[in-house]
Amino acid sequence: MKSVLCRNLGCIAIIAVLFSGCSSEKKLSQISGKVSFKGKPVPAGYVTFTPDVGKGTNGQVVGFQIKDGNYDSIRNTPPGIAPGSYKLSIAGFDGVVIPFFGQGKQIFNPINNECVVPEGVSTKDIEVPNSAGENVKIEKTADT
C-alpha cells in the first residue's frame, strides 16, 4: 500500500514538473508615453506597435489610443505588450468629433518610428516632426 502511494505521488510530481514550463503566455510589459506635435499634446489618435519580425519579435499588432497627448498599454485587454522590437505608426487628430471623422480632423500625416519595449515598465515619448503637418492627406478611417 505504501509503495503504491509513493509511486502515485512520484507520478504526480513528475507530471507537475513537466507541465510547469508549458505556459504559452508571455509576461507582458507596460509602456506609456506622451505624443506631441509642434510642442503641444496630440488631442486624439493612436500609436500602433507592429512586431519587427526581422529583429526576432513575433506576436500580435497592438494599438493604443492617444487621449489628451497620452497613451498607455494598461488600458488594453490584455493590459500590456510583449517585450521586443516594434515598428510604430502614429496618427493624430484634433479631437473635435464631426460626422465621418470620429476622432476629428487629421492634424499630421501618419509617421513611422521604431521602438524596443523592454521587460517591465517603460516610457516612450514621441515628438511628431513639424514636417508631418505639411500637405496633410486626409486618410479614410473605420469611422468614414
Predicted feature residues:
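Glycine/proline-rich low-complexity segments that form flexible loops, beta-turns, and polyproline
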Residues: 2-144
